[in-house]
Curated annotation (Swiss-Prot):
Transmembrane segment boundaries: 3-23, 47-67, 87-107, 113-133, 150-170, 188-208, 220-240, 252-272
Name assigned to this protein: Undecaprenyl-diphosphatase
Cellular localisation: Cell membrane
Organism: Alkaliphilus oremlandii (strain OhILAs)
EC numbers for this chain: 3.6.1.27
Membrane topology, record value: Multi-pass membrane protein
GO molecular function: undecaprenyl-diphosphatase activity
Length: 279
């Protein structure tokens, strides 16, 4: 592997680590970055890489929340272990809608919606939604401030919002956070629940892509995958910590404005470059 290719992989890992957890669409950013940074690999490998690199990001959540999510921790009382198991039950309930829809329509969505128009439109639409919802909630208090207050029905409804994230440019975390806030969840719990729901969803998506691609990797492909995942892991730890510290005293409007700005830039760029936005 050349130094240039290694730097490309490192950069892609950084983008994944930042955008996976901020409500700004990791898939949308990866599509856009690929316009400027092309890996020297087959189309099948690149499609698989952009999904499997998320495993590094997911392991950051597992590490940061290991104690909170571990129902077998010796330091926990029986009551705390039961509470931890309830978190997992609510995660399972929440991922059912997106899991089912993803299995049924993943190929169709990739074929028909994996384009710059869709990405730009979803960036702008959800940017506007973030601003509207945060303005509406400015003087409201959250009804759900802990996982014990999160009901199974609310968890399922948040899962329905996550289905929207199957559309490129939406943002899985963005869709679930918006849904959770609309349903009365605090920003902090909304973000954490979004993180926890991502664990089985992204492990499952990565497993599907790996099975489709096969496990017959070249040495260069192995280095590419491992490097991307390690970088995404390290950057994700930093991004998650910064995001959780930020939302303790701030709302998500800044991310809404960023999404609108980026969506407009995307439309402008691809209109200027020979109408590629129509491809």
């Amino acid at each position: 592997m050349s130094i240039i290719e290694l730097l490309k992989v490192i950069f892609l890992g950084i983008v994944e680590g930042i955008t996976e957890w901020l409500p700004i669409s990791s898939t949308g950013h990866m599509i856009l970055v690929e316009e400027f940074i092309q890996l020297n690999a087959s189309a099948a490998f690149k499609e698989m890489f952009f999904v499997v690199v998320q495993l590094g990001a997911i392991m950051a959540v597992v590490l940061l929340y290991f104690n909170k999510l571990n129902p077998f921790a010796l330091s926990k009382t029986k009551r705390e272990k039961r509470e931890t198991m309830r978190i997992w039950y609510k995660v399972v309930v929440g991922i059912i809608p997106a899991g089912v829809m993803g299995l049924l329509f993943d190929d169709w969505l990739n074929e028909h919606l994996y384009n710059y128009w869709t990405v730009a439109a979803m960036l702008i639409v959800y940017g506007v939604l973030f601003i509207i919802i945060e303005n509406r909630n400015k003087h409201r208090y959250a009804k759900i401030n802990s996982f014990s207050e999160l009901s199974y029905s609310t968890a399922f409804l948040i899962g329905l919002f996550q289905v929207l994230s199957l559309i490129p440019g939406t943002s899985r975390s963005g869709a679930t956070i918006i849904g959770a806030i609309i349903l009365g969840t605090s920003r902090y719990i909304a973000a954490e629940y979004s993180f926890f729901m991502s664990i089985p969803i992204m492990f499952g998506a990565s497993a599907v892509k790996l099975l489709k691609f096969g496990f017959n990797f070249t040495s260069i492909e192995i280095i590419t995958l491992v490097t991307g995942m390690v970088v995404a892991f390290v950057v994700s730890i930093i991004a998650i910590r910064l995001l959780m510290a930020y939302i303790k005293n701030n709302d998500f409007k800044a991310f809404g404005w960023y999404r609108i700005f980026l969506g407009v830039v995307v439309i402008g760029y691809f209109l200027i470059t020979n109408g590629k936005v129509l491809s």
